[in-house]
Amino acid sequence: MNIVVCIKQVPDTTEVKINPQTGTLIREGVPSIMNPDDKGGLEYALQLKDKYGAHVTVITMGLPQAEAILREALAMGVDRAILLTDRKLGGADTLATSSAIAGALRTMDFDLIITGRQAIDGDTAQVGPQIAEHLDLPQVSYMEDLQYNEATKTFTIKKQLEDGYQVLEMQAPCVVTALASSVQPRYMTVSGIVTAFDKEVEVWGADRINVPEEHIGKAGSPTSVFKSFPKQLKPAGQTFEVTPEEAVELIVNKLKEKHII
C-alpha cells in the first residue's frame, strides 16, 4: 500500500499578529509548525504503516524553509519526503495550490491520499477536496477514524457530522481529509530525529509537475486575500433578574438606548 500525505507549514496562530496598515499577517519572527490537521492525517498514515507495512510519502508546497516539517515527518517515521518549491508557484490560492499538488501526485503511485481538513492560516478546507476533483477520485472529508481491509482493498472511514457521524466505505485509490482532534500524533524519537537528517528531501520545481503555468501560482489563482483582521472583542454582557413582563420593557428600552429601534 502506498500512502501520500499532503502537509503544510503554517505560522503558529498563537503568535500571529496583523499589520494594521496593510491588513496582512506578519510572518517575520513568528514560529512555524506543521498544520495540526495535516499532522493528524500523518498519524493515520503511520498507523497503517505499522499495521500493514504501507509506504508513506509526505509532500508539501512552500518556501525552502518548509523542509523543516518534512524533516519532522521523517523523524516520525515516513519513508519519503518531497518539497515542491518554485517561484512560479508563489501567490497561489487554493485552486492553484491544489492544481500544483495534483500535478505532482499524478507522477506517483498511491492507494490513498490524506490531507488535513483545513489549514489554520486559511481555514478554507478546500485544498483536499479540490485535489480529489483534479484527480477524479472519490473523497471523504472530516475523517475521524480510518480502517483498511486488505482482502477487498477498501477503506472504511468514520466521517464527522454536526450531530453524529457516518461510516463510509471507499475503494482505493481515494482521498480523505483528517481532523487533528480525532487522533494523538506520535512524538519524534531520538533515533528518528538522527535518521531524519541522513535522509534525502527531494526538491521538485514547477517543471516536474507538468501543469500549465496559467493554472499555478498567482496566474492560476482566481481569488486573493483582500484583508485580514483580528477578531473584534465584544464588551461583557449584562445580567438582569426581572419578571417576564419587566423583561419586555427592559429589552425595548435597551434597544432604544442603542438606537436600534
Predicted regions span which residues?
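N-terminal glycine-rich FAD/FM-binding segment characteristic of electron-transfer flavoproteins
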Residues: 1-261
